[in-house]
Amino acid sequence: MKKVYHYIIHYVRTYLLLELLAGLWLTVKYFFRKKITVQFPEEQTPLSPRFRGLLALRRYPNGEERCIACKLCEAVCPALAITIESEQREDGSRRTTRYDIDMFKCINCGLCEESCPVDSIVVTPIHHYHISERGQNIMTKEKLLAVGDLMETQLAADRAADEKYR
């Protein structure tokens, strides 16, 4: 009797394709559920307030750049993506002559932002940028300052909202 039972079970599993029907049932079940896919260019999910996107350099309200060339961000960068050159000014303070970030090396860890004593380098919520030619991966001081000027109002508001956590 056990042998006949074994043959019946083998027949049902082999010829009725129960595994295939179970897989098809799972597919049909999900086919009629609400879709969770986001059509990216047209629709976007909301970003976290602490999202780390494109880097920027900020200025003081009088227009002077904030960076004091302490090179802490260059020292703390684990990917060695930041290159800084500086010189002394007439008044004795240091300012950067070159501030480059290689975006191919940058891992968006945010350590440069945390180490900056004057809030000069910051991360922005910009995540739509592309590189179409060789050499565009280097964010120069001018590009970084331009991004900072563009985003200054939002960056200041984000800093004010995040102040109690810093």
Swiss-Prot record:
Keyword Aminoacyl-tRNA synthetase: no
Enzyme Commission designation: 7.1.1.-
Cofactor dependency: [4Fe-4S] cluster
Catalytically driven reaction(s): a quinone + NADH + 5 H(+)(in) = a quinol + NAD(+) + 4 H(+)(out)
Uppermost EC category: translocase
Membrane topology of the entry: Peripheral membrane protein
This protein's UniProt keywords: 4Fe-4S, Cell inner membrane, Cell membrane, Iron, Iron-sulfur, Membrane, Metal-binding, NAD, Quinone, Repeat, Translocase, Ubiquinone
Cysteines engaged in disulfide bonds, as pairs: none
InterPro entries xrefs: 4Fe4S_Fe-S-bd, 4Fe4S_Fe_S_CS, NADH_quinone_OxRdtase_chainI
Gene Ontology CC terms, in alphabetical order: plasma membrane
Protein residues bound to [4Fe-4S] cluster 1: C67, C70, C73, C116
Cofactor note as given: Binds 2 [4Fe-4S] clusters per subunit.
Domain annotation 4Fe-4S ferredoxin-type: ranges: 57-87, 97-126
SUPFAM superfamilies assigned to the protein according to its UniProt record, in alphabetical order: alpha-helical ferredoxin
Pfam families with a match to the protein in the record: Fer4_7 (PF12838)
Subcellular localization, as worded in the UniProt entry: Cell inner membrane
GO MF annotation, one: 4 iron, 4 sulfur cluster binding
NCBIfam families named among the record's database cross-references: NuoI, PRK05888.1-4
Family stated for the protein in its record: Belongs to the complex I 23 kDa subunit family.
Assembly and binders: NDH-1 is composed of 14 different subunits. Subunits NuoA, H, J, K, L, M, N constitute the membrane sector of the complex.
Role noted for this protein: NDH-1 shuttles electrons from NADH, via FMN and iron-sulfur (Fe-S) centers, to quinones in the respiratory chain. The immediate electron acceptor for the enzyme in this species is believed to be ubiquinone. Couples the redox reaction to proton translocation (for every two electrons transferred, four hydrogen ions are translocated across the cytoplasmic membrane), and thus conserves the redox energy in a proton gradient.
Database matches in HAMAP family: NDH1_NuoI (MF_01351)
Name listed for the protein in its UniProt record: NADH-quinone oxidoreductase subunit I
Name of the gene: nuoI
